[in-house]
Curated annotation (Swiss-Prot):
Cross-link Glycyl lysine isopeptide (Lys-Gly) (interchain with G-Cter in SUMO2) residue location(s): K208, K215
Chain residue ranges for the region called Basic motif: 215-239
Annotated phenotype, changing S63A: Impaired CDK3-mediated phosphorylation and altered transactivation and transcriptional activities
The encoding gene: ATF1
The organism's place on the tree of life at top rank: Eukaryota
Lineage of source species: Eukaryota, Metazoa, Chordata, Craniata, Vertebrata
InterPro entries noted in UniProt: bZIP, bZIP_sf, CREB1-like_pKID, Leuzip_CREB
Record's protein name: Cyclic AMP-dependent transcription factor ATF-1
Site (Breakpoint for translocation to form chimeric EWSR1/ATF1 protein): I110
PANTHER family documented for this protein: CYCLIC AMP RESPONSE ELEMENT-BINDING PROTEIN B, CYCLIC AMP-DEPENDENT TRANSCRIPTION FACTOR ATF-1
Organism of provenance: Homo sapiens
Protein family: Belongs to the bZIP family. ATF subfamily.
Compartments it resides in: Nucleus
Disease: Angiomatoid fibrous histiocytoma: A distinct variant of malignant fibrous histiocytoma that typically occurs in children and adolescents and is manifest by nodular subcutaneous growth. Characteristic microscopic features include lobulated sheets of histiocyte-like cells intimately associated with areas of hemorrhage and cystic pseudovascular spaces, as well as a striking cuffing of inflammatory cells, mimicking a lymph node metastasis.
Site (Breakpoint for translocation to form chimeric FUS/ATF1 protein): I112
GO molecular function: DNA-binding transcription activator activity, RNA polymerase II-specific; DNA-binding transcription factor activity; DNA-binding transcription factor activity, RNA polymerase II-specific; identical protein binding; protein-containing complex binding; RNA polymerase II cis-regulatory region sequence-specific DNA binding; RNA polymerase II transcription regulatory region sequence-specific DNA binding
Amino acid sequence: MEDSHKSTTSETAPQPGSAVQGAHISHIAQQVSSLSESEESQDSSDSIGSSQKAHGILARRPSYRKILKDLSSEDTRGRKGDGENSGVSAAVTSMSVPTPIYQTSSGQYIAIAPNGALQLASPGTDGVQGLQTLTMTNSGSTQQGTTILQYAQTSDGQQILVPSNQVVVQTASGDMQTYQIRTTPSATSLPQTVVMTSPVTLTSQTTKTDDPQLKREIRLMKNREAARECRRKKKEYVKCLENRVAVLENQNKTLIEELKTLKDLYSNKSV
């Protein structure tokens, strides 16, 4: 009986080593579970932080609407700048151009106005005197071409500009009249864009020749021209004489040589 009771007690009584081992295993299991929970919480926090960071980056990026708005504002600003530049260029082109003034070889001044009028003036002691205006009118409002001007000389020696289709006629009184030559229009003819009013009387300022001072100046001018022509003819005559003298000298030399040869021949024959 005692033996059986000991065996049962030995079987039912707990062993101290197994209890310690079970407690250690449970402690390790708790540590593993706590580590897994901490890792899961860290992973969840990392995922939340990365999602928040991506959301912040997307929030900081400009939207397509904002980009389109910026581009449209820059386009309107560029158009405004172009409009201002065009306004400035239009203001610059609307400035008036000064009237050009030309001077001929005789000292006469010619001014071409913007409306096509020719203003003729001769220089004087007190400035420009004797202003004459020649009105130029367009024969066709839609035709455009080139106007050809030519010189015409008045009775007092002044030169004026008239179109190429004008004829200048001097009357017995000394006045100058210009007449226009009109041509029948055809398909091959050039358009006549500038026409001078016909007839236009150009009265000379110094038509009277009774002034003794003017007569004296004319006489002196003619004398100077005659003296210049006389000197030119004298120079030509002297040059011609010099050439003739040179030719005669050459002939004289040849004759002297022939004479010497004849003398030698005669002396030889006489011996």
